[in-house]
Amino acid sequence: MIMKRFLIVLTCVLGTMSLAKADDRPVTVDQLPQAARTFLNVNFPDDKISFATKDDDLIRPDYQVVLASGVMVKFNNAGGLEEIESRGREIPDGIIPIQIVEMVKGHYPDVMITGYEVGRRTYEVKLSNRIELKLDRNFNVIEIDD
């Protein structure tokens, strides 16, 4: 009986902790992980950072950076790219794996890649014609959302 109550209380506590979300807090460029700073300097050398925040989520802390051009980039705690949204602009070459770029150019020659997200098992690509593609880790299209 005591063990059952303990498990119920533990489940409630863990559930509450997972739902409790710390607010994003502003950070300076120097507080971003080195890999994130390098990514921004290489891919957006002439774009200034409007603001950067850190989400201190207990499970997966991450950083979000918004550039003056409106580009939003999300990094994991180590500075690895998680997501990029370009708000109607083409994402610079070199950010997206060449296999995805070539596939998009082959099937959608007149559109730009405007969004890219790296998941644990998939990639998601947003195109300027509002089509969204989901690919597996072998770059096979597994879902098309239009």
Where in this protein do the model-derived segments appear?
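Long, terminal "pre-/pro-" and other extracytoplasmic accessory regions
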Residues: 2, 6-8, 18-146
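Repetitive helical segments and hydrophobic/amphipathic motifs
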Residues: 13-14
